[in-house]
Amino acid sequence: MTRIAKPLIKSAMAAGLVTASMSLSTAVAHAGPSPNWDAVAQCESGGNWAANTGNGKYGGLQFKPATWAAFGGVGNPAAASREQQIAVANRVLAEQGLDAWPTCGAASGLPIALWSKPAQGIKQIINEIIWAGIQASIPR
């Protein structure tokens, strides 16, 4: 193999790994640990999934109406089922991490550092893979 071909093959392999990992990311998005939403609701609202305490937040997980609507919730969160609230909470978690529940996120049972900014963690992993591919392609 020539001196040029070997680094090109390594770069192509690194690019393939990045592409494959990005393709699989949606397939394995739910493969990790799941939050204990009942524990978060217990902390947020005393476990009352129909909570409406007058503080501007509603439901067991204490959604603000704007957040609820932005992540696919319909109507008032306090009137939604536990399952509907959890579905919206999972979408909020994917984008905002546990920071969306600053007081009670720790009750989820998930490591806060891992779930604080999930998109940032994915970006960091991809950058590390790309950097490793670049370093591997540099002739020695």
UniProtKB/Swiss-Prot annotation:
Family: Belongs to the transglycosylase family. Rpf subfamily.
NCBIfam families linked to this entry: ResusProRpfC
Transmembrane portions of the chain: none
A Pfam family assignment: Transglycosylas
GO biological process: negative regulation of gene expression; quorum sensing; regulation of cell population proliferation
Main subcellular location: secreted
EC code(s) of this entry: 3.-.-.-
Molecular function via GO: hydrolase activity
Enzyme type, top EC level: hydrolase
Physiological role: Factor that stimulates resuscitation of dormant cells. Has peptidoglycan (PG) hydrolytic activity.
Signal sequence residues: 1-31
Induction: By the metal chelator phenanthroline via Rip1.
Keywords: Hydrolase, Secreted, Signal
UniProt-recorded name of the protein: Resuscitation-promoting factor RpfC
Localization in the cell: Secreted
One GO cellular component term: extracellular region
InterPro entries linked to this entry: Lysozyme-like_dom_sf (IPR023346), RPF (IPR010618)
